[in-house]
Amino acid sequence: MTLRPSLLPLHLLLLLLLSAAVCRAEAGLETESPVRTLQVETLVEPPEPCAEPAAFGDTLHIHYTGSLVDGRIIDTSLTRDPLVIELGQKQVIPGLEQSLLDMCVGEKRRAIIPSHLAYGKRGFPPSVPADAVVQYDVELIALIRANYWLKLVKGILPLVGMAMVPALLGLIGYHLYRKANRPKVSKKKLKEEKRNKSKKK
């Protein structure tokens, strides 16, 4: 089989692209993460039946160990006090926060978190590379339930603060407008009024 000279560059380009794709696959440099969704596995069941699992607004005390898929540890709280977080306040990566929902005190879970729910394209240099899948082993040590009023205050207080700023600016503007449009009395009239008042006395 002979190739026409005009198709030779096209075949060479196709061969080059194919070999580059094979080399990249063999080197393990795939651009897409092998894990696309959050995977949560219970390692240790809670010691007693759990009446009230963790929910948004609750304060959790957790011990955790975070690692890459290859086993390299990126962070752990086992050598220090438990981490204290409030669910729903985005204090930890999204995948870890999602894995803590409905957890009970004494329960241990393993969460395998895809990069878009972890550190994303930037990573967390130097310990977490870009687009890395991470694994967290988490134990819930204590749970402080948020009461209804506390949730209400935390939900409404920022809105009230945001509404107060325009209201105060409006009041200040109104006061300045009234002050600027008040009829001005000349100094002569003020002196005359003062004299007239003193004469009447």
From Swiss-Prot:
SUPFAM superfamilies: FKBP-like
Gene Ontology CC annotation, any one: endoplasmic reticulum
Compartment list: Membrane
Superkingdom field: Eukaryota
Bilayer topology annotation: Single-pass membrane protein
Reactions listed under catalytic activity: [protein]-peptidylproline (omega=180) = [protein]-peptidylproline (omega=0)
Subunit structure: Interacts with IFITM5.
Protein name, entry field: Peptidyl-prolyl cis-trans isomerase FKBP11
Biological classification of the source: Eukaryota, Metazoa, Chordata, Craniata, Vertebrata
Chain's gene name: FKBP11
